[in-house]
């Protein structure tokens, strides 16, 4: 007989299930978090590890009662980090939707611009952050995630830009200016409940420049609108400028792109006229067979130059943003982005003080209705047994550990800023403790599960029914094991591997991405620790 299990999202654990003893309140008492020796440490030398949840969109601006209850609930579970994620999302009407609430959004979209804070939303955001800090829960702050650029923002081209648009925020100068403005306003605003700005608060673990973005990422049709046409043209123009800088003339480019009499440069393509096509991206860096068809749309020569260009654009943008955040006074590690898998893409994000990645197994990728995933039977829809089948995204196998490990870089701390498994039991129920154990083996620094809840209220989601597969607040497989997971990971109860395997990339390796690229991550992190090493000068490796 099936029986419903009731798990309320805002009721604190009590008795032996109260894991608040794992926390050391208030957050920040050991000083600012630092990146050193490849890991996160507090200022007083204490090793820092973090396990917690994302709270997305409208969940960032709860009313005071909800903030009090959720902080108490999280602390009782042993949660010591919350990622305040996508607080910049546009307003949505439907309760529980992945959007900001109309009553108190962080950004005042109703004013016709995304450049102003809504006073009520900012006050709620401040209060929530203060209550989390009070309980010993640290903060992961991200900047641009879901922002919808409005025409009133003074955009360079007519119209705005859709929410969650990718790639162009790394290219367009006006978008970059607006990101810096938002960073300054958010990070330097003094929270009246703590007396500190986020930039000065040791309760902040890291500041993430953007979410799931890269100069070589595609939009999967999300940029097809007429208002995005000049942004698409800007990327092509930048690529052609890069080719001219490298080759000087079309003839030199043609010579470089010719092999065995086959030229990859079309007769109509000329970098001086800005007509050389780039590579269309996707969720991840697209694959490229180095022995593939030479004049294919993603042939080896075109691909190699576009990856070199993408690395240049990523590093230029992230170095600039990181310098600006430090100029504002940041004292904690700054991370570039996440959801990165290809070798060139990972290398292009290594200017951050730590590395992060997102990793999912059995991700539904279902159609969105009213800006959220509310579907019947999503777990049944996506269930794949990882013991018998591993799906692939480009060159990457999508088991949690193998996909996450693609972005680990030697000498950098590492966290999963989003991860989850969405299939049915029995493998769903084992995925979470298993991940915590392997994270210990590989000596990772943080695991932030996506997503605890999507609501600004503590009492408007059912305790005994899963309506949104992405909200785990009442998922028995997650919640019933969480305290044990917290003990395992935060205490390091699984020993770190005795040996570490370095996976080496030369600069030439970054110009291609064969299908077997991710093969090392399907094996090494399960038996030992592994890190990626990128050689900046020559091919000599001193291990």
Segments and roles (model prediction):
Residues 19, 239, 243, 253, ...:
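Generic structural signal of hydrophobic/aromatic residues within well-ordered alpha-helices
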Residues 2-4, 283-288, 399-402:
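Short acidic/polar alpha-helix capping motifs at helix-coil junctions
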Residues 132, 188, 314-336, 341-364, ...:
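Catalytic-core region of carbohydrate-active enzymes that cleave or remodel glycosidic bonds
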Residues 27-323, 327-352:
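Active-site mouth of glycoside hydrolases
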Residues 11-19, 139-147, 276-290, 374-393:
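Short N-terminal signal/transit or membrane-insertion segments
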Residues 364-371:
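Short, charged, surface-exposed secondary-structure boundary motifs
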Residues 1-30:
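N-terminal pre-domain segments of enzymes
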């Amino acid at each position: 007989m099936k029986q419903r299990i009731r798990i309320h999202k805002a009721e604190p654990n009590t008795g032996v299930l109260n894991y608040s003893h794992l926390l050391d309140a208030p957050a920040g008492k050991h000083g600012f978090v630092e990146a050193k020796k490849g890991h996160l440490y507090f200022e007083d030398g204490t090793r820092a590890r973090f396990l917690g949840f994302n709270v997305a969109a409208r969940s960032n601006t709860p009313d005071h009662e909800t903030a009090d209850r959720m902080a108490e609930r999280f602390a009782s579970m042993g949660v010591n980090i919350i990622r305040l994620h996508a607080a910049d999302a546009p307003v949505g009407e439907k309760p529980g939707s992945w959007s900001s609430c109309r009553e108190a959004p962080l950004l005042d979209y109703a004013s016709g611009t995304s450049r102003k804070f809504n006073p009520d939303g900012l006050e709620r955001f401040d209060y929530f952050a203060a209550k989390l800090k009070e309980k010993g829960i640290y903060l992961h702050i991200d900047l641009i995630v879901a922002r919808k650029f409005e025409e009133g923002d003074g955009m360079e081209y007519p119209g705005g830009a859709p929410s969650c648009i990718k790639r162009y925020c790394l290219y367009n100068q006006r978008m970059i200016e607006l990101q810096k403005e938002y960073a300054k306003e958010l990070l330097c605003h003094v929270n009246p409940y703590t007396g500190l700005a986020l930039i000065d608060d040791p309760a902040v673990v890291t500041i993430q420049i953007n979410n799931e973005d890269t100069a070589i990422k595609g939009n999967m049709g999300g940029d097809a609108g007429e208002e995005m046409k000049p942004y698409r043209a800007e990327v092509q123009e930048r690529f052609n400028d890069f080719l001219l800088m490298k080759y000087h003339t079309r003839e030199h480019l043609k010579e470089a792109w010719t092999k065995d009499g086959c030229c990859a440069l079309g007769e109509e393509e000329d970098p001086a006229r800005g007509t050389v096509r780039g590579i269309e991206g996707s969720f991840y860096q697209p694959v490229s067979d180095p022995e593939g068809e030479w004049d294919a749309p993603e042939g080896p020569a075109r691909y190699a130059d576009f990856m070199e260009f993408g690395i240049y654009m990523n590093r230029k943008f992230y170095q600039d943003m990181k310098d600006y955040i430090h100029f504002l006074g940041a004292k904690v590690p700054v991370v570039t982005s996440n959801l990165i898998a290809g070798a060139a893409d990972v290398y292009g994000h290594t200017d951050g003080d730590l590395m992060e990645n997102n990793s999912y197994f059995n991700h539904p990728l279902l159609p969105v209705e009213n800006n959220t995933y509310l579907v019947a039977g999503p777990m049944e829809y996506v269930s794949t047994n990882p013991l018998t089948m591993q799906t692939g995204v480009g060159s990457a196998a999508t088991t949690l550990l193998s996909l996450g490990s693609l972005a680990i870089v030697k000498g950098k701390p590492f966290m999963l800023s989003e991860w989850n498994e969405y299939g049915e039991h029995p493998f769903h129920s084992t995925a979470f403790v298993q991940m915590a154990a392997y994270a210990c083996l590989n000596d990772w620094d943080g695991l932030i599960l996506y997503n605890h809840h999507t609501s600004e209220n503590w009492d408007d989601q059912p305790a005994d029914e899963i309506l949104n597969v992405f909200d785990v607040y009442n998922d028995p497989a997650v919640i019933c094991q969480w305290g044990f997971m917290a003990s395992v990971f935060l205490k390091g109860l699984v020993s770190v591997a005795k040996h570490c395997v370095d996976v080496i990339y030369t600069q030439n390796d970054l110009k291609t991405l064969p299908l077997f690229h991710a093969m090392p991550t399907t094996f090494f992190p399960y038996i030992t620790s592994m890190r990626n090493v990128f050689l900046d000068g020559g091919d000599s490796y001193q291990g």
